[in-house]
Amino acid sequence: FGRNKDVTCEECHETYQVGASDELDDDGFLVRRIEESVCPNCRNPNKILKLPVFKGDRILVNKFTYQVGNPQRWDVIVFRYPEDMQKNYIKRLVGLPGETIRIGRGDVYARQGDQGEFEILRKQNPEKQKLLQLLVYDDRHAPVDLLAKGFPERWTPMARENAPPQNATEPVPSTDPVPPAKPIDGWVRDEKSWKHDPATRSFTIEAGVEATKWVRYQHLVPSQSDWKDLAAANELPYQARPQLITDFCGYNTYTGGRSFNMDDDRFWVGDLTLNCTVEINSITPASATGSPNPELILELTEGVRHYVCRINAATGLATLLRNDELAADASVADITMATAPTPIRGTGKYTLSFANVDDRLCLWVNSTWMSSGLIPFGSGAEFTPPANRNPQASDLTPAGFAVQGLGARVSDLVLQRDIYYRAESVANDAGDFSSHEPELVDSSRIRESLTDPLEYGARYSKNANEAMFNALGPDEFFVMGDNSPRSQDSRLWPNSRRHAVNRHAVPRNALLGKAFFIYWPHGIPFLNSGRGFPVINHTPARDRNGPLVETYPDYAAPFYPQWWRWKRIR
C-alpha cells in the first residue's frame, strides 16, 4: 500500500484500506482531508476523517536478480520512473521485450512483434492469481442491521422456475423479508431445500433430497442513498434489484482529497472466484436417490458460458464442464473439460475455492499456508472464450453451489473477482495527456445498464475501445499497477521530457530490482483509544490567509508492528 488509512466498516465490520495520497500536494503538504470512504463489502459510507494515516509499506528489493537473469512476467519490480529518473516506482511487469500489448474487457493480451495471434496473459502460477483476487462480497461480514430492515440477502436458495416439484417436506420459512419481484434468468426462490441460519451465516440441507438443490448469489448492492433511506425511514422505498459485478475498488472510493468525488465503477467483471467451507454430514447411497453419484457442485457463469465443477463426494473425483453455447437445444449435455482426483472422501469438513480467471478454471481443496491444495487438471482446464463476450441475464446470478444426495452445511462464503485492467492509453507521441483515450467513448449511461446485462452489453460494444501499444524494443518492458483505475503506469505515462519512441516502455537500464518481501508494514498505534499520541503533525499548505486545512498527526506512538503482514511479495 501507499499512503493509506485502515478502516473497519461500522456496519458489516469488514476491514479494508483506503488510499490517502490525495490529501497531499506534489510537494507533500497537506491540502485536503479524506472525509468518507465506502466499504467494498456492504457499501456503507464510513466516517474516516479522524482515523490515523499510515505511510506505505517498507519492502526489501533484490537488486541482484536482474543482473544475473531476466525479469519474469508478473514479477513485482522496482524501477526508475522513465519520465523522471529521480523517482522510484513499483509496478507489476506485464509485457516482455519484443511484445505488442493489447488490453480489452479487463484482460491483457500479447503477441510477438506486429504479427501473429494475440494470446491472453494469464498468471502461469495459479497461486499468484489467487493472491491477486479482490473482494466482491464476504458473507461472514454481512450487514446484519441492513438485512434486518428489509434489504435482501445476496445468497439465496433458488430453483428453476419450471422445475418439477420435489418430495421435500414442509417449506422452510424465509429469513429474507424481501422476495424477488420476478425470476432472475429463470431462477426463483426455493423454500423447500436449504435452510439458512443468519446467525451463523450458513446453509444446511438434509440428505435424501432427490434433485440438485442450489444456493445462488445475486449482486444486490445497497447504494449510499439506500443507507440514508434506511437511516431516515427504517425501510427501503423500492425493491432492490440485482446487477452486474463491477470493478469497484474500495481503496479508491472516498470523498475529500484532491479528487473531489468517488471513482465510478462501471465495468463488468466476469472473472470470479467462489470460496466456501463445506461440511458433508451424510451421503445417501446412489441406489436411494436414483442418481449415479452423490455430488457437490460449484458453478460460475460468464456471459453465454456456464462453468461447472462436479465433485463425487464418495470418490473425490472432480470433473470440470462447460455448456455448449452454440447448441440449439439447451438440454444438450455439457462438454467435459478435465477430471482430477481431490482429497474429498465422504463425510468431513473441506474448504474449497473454484475460480474462472483468465480463460482457465482452477480448484483448490483444503488450501493452507503449508499446502497449496491446487487440484492438477492440466491444460484441459484452459479454454478459448466464446465469440459473444457480452454479459447475459445469467450474470445476475453468476455464482452458485449445490448438492445432490448429500446432507451438508456450507459456510464462509466469499466471492472475489479478478483485477480489471482498464483499456486506457495515450497516443504514442511526445506530450502529456491531450490525446488520452478512455475505455469508453461515452460512459454517461453505462452504469444505468448494470441491472440489464443485454443493454449493458449493447452500450459497451458500441462505445468501447481496446488499448494497443507499439511493440516493445529488445530491452524494454511494459508495467501496470494492481490498482488499475488509479495506477500511473505504462498505459498513461507522459512523454514531454524524454520524447521516447515508446512512451509506454521501461528500459532495462531503469530496473532497480525485484520486490520480494514486506519487512515493515506500518505499525498500529495503541493507547489513547487506539490512536496513540501525536509525535509529528502534517505540515498544511498555506495561502495568504493561513493554513488551507487543519493539521492532524503524521506519526503517532506507541505502536506495534503488523507481524502477520510480513510476507513474500508474489
Q: Where do the model's predicted regions map?
A:
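Extended hydrophobic leader/signal-anchor segments used for secretion and membrane insertion
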Residues: 1-570
